[in-house]
């Protein structure tokens, strides 16, 4: 190995890593919410739509919480209908995907635990984003921007 090769990014040095996320936990949250109104009440106290890594999950979550806030049931039929009205059903994977979300959940009682995982991964992603921004500022040619960012 040449000296230059030692400094080249390798496959395991991962400059292009996947951000922290747990898609199974996200699916578990959404499936649990569609199974139980109590799960919705538990989850909405912990999770924001932006905590979801997968954009389709964010859209599904928003539809569930919209229905819940209007006092309507949020189950497979009503969530599918809500997404259809918004023109989003196909984009999130269709009715079959929503059914899969429900089928994969062993019990709606675990939705709160899954929500904690989703929030934890979202917090880690935000830390990675902040760290990346700090690195970018450190390499910026204009030191004034760095000082301004540190003081804010």
Model regions and ranges:
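Interdomain "pre-motor" coupling segment immediately N-terminal to P-loop NTPase/helicase cores
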Residues: 100-152
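Noncatalytic partner-interaction/assembly domains of nucleic-acid and motor enzyme complexes
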Residues: 1-122
